[in-house]
Amino acid sequence: MALSAVQKVVLFSCLVLCVSLLLPRAYIARGKPAAQEGNTGLFQSSGHHPKPTDGRPGGAHFPRSHMAEAMSKAKGGTGGGGGGGTRPSLVGQIIPIYGFGILLYILYILFKLSSKGKSTKQEPTTQPVANGNLKRKITDYELSQLQDKLKETEEAMEKIISRLGPNSERTDNVSSDEETDLLQRLKEITRVMKEGKILDGISPEKEAEEAPYMEDWNGYPEETYPVYDPSDCKRTQQTILVDCSALNRPSAEQVAEQMGFDEEDDQENGSGNLAKEPDYKDSVGGDQQAQGTISAQGKVVGTGEDIEEDEDEDEDPEVIAENAGFISDSCNEEEDPKESFMDLGNEKGPLGATLGSNRDETGTLRKRNTKGIEY
């Protein structure tokens, strides 16, 4: 059974790891018995001395200096044995770590080789993609492979066309199988190239445009088509008439403002006329001959001197403003001026005289003065 390159490298790394773990133990096992033998020999030689034949004790024969030297030698022998035992133990600790690092390095090299092998290995021909998997991404490597296939098919088609030319006589050499194979390859390549251009964010409109029409497709429903009525173009639109007089009329706010201004002017003029009433009463006794008739339009007709005074007062701007206010008030309040003036003409006493003096000075009858006179 043939092993692949990856399996061989893994097996070799396992062997190296096992050896690195077992060798230190073997060295340590050999060093311990040798150290024990050396230590026992020293203690036996130092402990068993020949007994003296004389009656002297053994301790008295050797001085104390010799005993100290013997003890130091014994300690040095044991220390040397211990030092020899520590060296194999350090080696046993370092070798497994070193072997583990080698194993990691081998695995890293294997990973690199496997990744390179995947990139360089030629992939099989792409199968036609289903309609539901249109959004599949195509790598650059696949696109390069498709371009190479396109070049090959173009060259093959050029050869076929050159053989099938009018001047060529070798038309029988080209088989129909080759033509069908080339056509199938071209169809597959064009389909995959189109799918490669499709991105993840494709819109359904583009999908509908690129999707081929099915055999049982009957077209869009009639509801999607807009209803076109040519008679609408011939119809004439109705004209709209706008009343311009309504546009020129003042609004209610403008009318209210005008009425407010008129009332203010009337109040100012009324205060001035009330101050002049004593003068009017004094002039009644001296000017009893001044008589006038009131026309239907509100004008006072009298003597020549009165007419001249009326003309002077008509030129006064204050009188003009008061006349304008009187006209606006008379238009808003629908009252008959003739009846009010006739009632005032029938009255007697100083009120009639004051009315005559007012007529002489102002030249027109103000509604304000009539209201003040009535009460």
Swiss-Prot record:
Subcellular localization is given as: Endoplasmic reticulum membrane
Q: Which residues lie on this side of the membrane: Lumenal?
A: 30-90
GO terms for biological process?
positive regulation of protein localization to cell surface
**Which InterPro entries does this entry report, sorted A to Z?**
Ric3 (IPR026160), RIC3_N (IPR032763)
User: Which residue stretches does the UniProt record annotate as biased composition, category Basic residues?
Assistant: 365-375
Which interval of the chain is the signal sequence? 1-29
**Listed Acidic residues bias regions:** 305-319
Chief location of this protein within or outside the cell: endoplasmic reticulum
Topology relative to the membrane, per the entry? Single-pass membrane protein
> One cellular component GO annotation, for this chain's record?
endoplasmic reticulum membrane
Q: Which residues form a coiled coil?
A: 135-165
- Membrane spanning stretches: 91-111
Q: Which residues lie on this side of the membrane: Cytoplasmic?
A: 112-375
- Which UniProt keywords are given for this protein, alphabetically ordered? Chaperone, Coiled coil, Endoplasmic reticulum, Membrane, Signal, Transmembrane, Transmembrane helix
In this chain, composition skew of type Polar residues spans: 38-47, 286-296
Positions of the UniProt region annotated as Disordered: 38-63, 251-375
Family under the similarity heading:
Belongs to the ric-3 family.
Function according to Swiss-Prot or TrEMBL: Molecular chaperone which facilitates proper subunit assembly andsurface trafficking of alpha-7 (CHRNA7) and alpha-8 (CHRNA8) nicotinic acetylcholine receptors. May also promote functional expression of homomeric serotoninergic 5-HT3 receptors, and of heteromeric acetylcholine receptors.
Can you name this protein?
A: Protein RIC-3
Recall the taxonomic lineage recorded for the source organism.
Answer: Eukaryota, Metazoa, Chordata, Craniata, Vertebrata
Q: Which gene encodes it?
A: ric3
